[in-house]
Amino acid sequence: MREILADVMMDETGDSLDHYRLDYNRLAQGKLESVSRNTSTVKTLTVTVRESDEQAAVASLNALCNNLVSQMRSIDACKATRLDREHRLRLMAEVLRPGEEFRFDERRFEHQPGKPDTKDLVCPWSIDARNPTMLDIESLDSKYLHRTMWVSGLPPELSDQLVNDLTGLRARVDVSIHLAPMDRGESMTLVRRKNAEVKMQIMDQRRTNRKQGLDPDDLPDDLADQQEQLGQLRDELRSTNQRLVDSIIVIGVSAASQEELEVACRNVKAKVNAQSCTAESLKFMQMEGLTAELPLGNNPLPMKRTLTTNSAAILIPFTTQEVFEPHGLFYGSNARSGNPILADRRSHMNSNGFVLGTSGGGKSFTVKQEIAGMFLNRDDEVIVIDPEREYLALAAAFGGQIIQISAGTGTRVNPMDIVLEDDSASDPVKDKTNNVVSMIGALIGGIDGLDPLQKGLVDQCVSNLYTRYRNQGGGVVQPTLQDLHDELQAGGDQVSRYLADALNPYITGSMSGFNGQTNVDLSNRFTVFDVSGLSGELRTFGMMVVIDQVWNRVIRNKANGRRTWLYVDEFHRFFSNQYAAAQFKDIYKRARKYGLGVTGITQNVEEILDLQDAREMLSNSDFLMLLSQNSTDADALCELLTLSEEQRQYFTGVLPGQGLMKIGSAYVPFDGRIPAGGDLYRLYSTTFQEGK
């Protein structure tokens, strides 16, 4: 529990926001304490091969490992990473020296004098094995008791719940499953031999019955059952790809005291018994049991249980996808396992994503939780485009900047602003010119947009303005819409005058709010663009201007080594206009190279799924949060994302704040709900009654 809290909790920094960090920690700790499990589980797979020489063994092992990594990707997007020596030794040290700092360093080890042995770095200083049912293990900084048990009895029908239950115990428990598969020839030979043995027993029993004057066919039930089961197994091996596997399940329990050890072992036995199995202590074989526990693929124990491959597959512990990424944000608990979800969007192919859900499904609440975790614990910059005034209170509380964008305010954001210091390979003047042409097309182009001649004239005039601006050394005074109007007017031809006249209402008329130099601070770490006052033809244009300003900010942040996060609420509005849709798609595609993560938020799932560009963005995103959906939208999302019926149930008919989360290639059901009350909850909540 302490290790998990250390990954989740925020440190105080001494600024005015520390009371929010403390509230965040209170909510996170309360969430962790309320879920069914607070365990950190490490799952490893050790593969061993036997060949005639070391070179052949290495080649065989490499091929087998590559094949296994590929195959495991198909198990609910299970991501397997091959461990190097340092990581293998760390695993050993966690079992043999729990609580001690792991001190192995590959470079220092290679240059140590003499012949150093890695065993000296992971083995305990002493092991007292005089007690036949437990070991007393001691090292420099740790002393603990250890008992190894094995699952001696398995039921006729196995369940995958056994390993899951054991790893969920709040104790130091190591579960090792040894599987030694036989080839098909060995499997058939073993079945034939067992079948012959049972037949001999049946013949002996019949002779005994005759001597006693009994019916020769009156056989004990166990013999008849064995014969029937062996016949079924023989037929199954002949007709399918089934093979036999020798197996044993070993369970190691560690504790600081005898009392704690006995309690933990009783809990282990209770979990095993609940699955119709039996667990026994390895009396007089504790050292061998400890060896079998370690991730070495070495099993010196003589006991085994022979299973078919189908039965053995049930024991594989990769049944529940978990997301616990280093330096990740806390997103609540895994709805299936109860374990915490820590995800780091920065560590994936791209940081872009979407939050989708019906009205009242908890979209803005969930997004605010992520923003708070990001803003309070990192130096990243957060920008929100807010058409419904959902994020103003959060920005104000965190000392952010709220910029109201509308025609009637004194706030001015210049759509012609350009950043010339772009260290990318592209030409900033060319890129900005394309953006301005798109914005002008959205503003005065109507439904069909600008025709090629009009587009060419606007392109030429904008390019002229920026070329002169760059040749003059840039500076504070940027080109404006007035300058573009004058440049078009100076063209003299009919089309240029038409375009200049079309711009007039946005230069001197009632809708001239975007004409002039930018007069607001755009350097705050948390900026909310309030676009609720935009309507009519200015809505699309205004949102495009904001996106363009965001891109300018992203360029500056990239130069300063700072990551930017853009949240676009009701992002489907961008797809109502061809120019706006193209602009949003462009920034979405370029985001990764500039350290930008774009998050689209909407309840209009059906609308965006009708658009091919939006569908491609959704299907290629590394981050999705699917909150409660109606049946129609849920079906469409399942088809697009190839989701199963089981996954579908996690985002249909669920409570606000619950849903299905995609991070990388993993899909995890999540529960992000927090109890009402506290400073952050009041900032997150958008419920009318709670907001009063």
Where are these regions (language model features)?
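P-loop NTPase motor domains
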Residues: 24, 167-168, 182, 187-191, ...
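A short helix-turn-beta junction within AAA+ P-loop NTPase domains corresponding to the substrate/partner-engaging
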Residues: 399-403, 613-626
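Conserved P-loop NTPase
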Residues: 641-692
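Post-Walker A helix-loop "phosphate-sensing" segment adjacent to the P-loop in P-loop NTPases
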Residues: 373-383
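Conserved lysine of the Walker
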Residues: 363
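Hydrophobic anchor at the beta1->P-loop junction of P-loop NTPases
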Residues: 355
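Extended, folded cores of ATP/NTP-driven motor/assembly subunits in large transport
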Residues: 1-317
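Hydrophobic positions on the alpha1 helix immediately C-terminal to the Walker A/P-loop
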Residues: 366
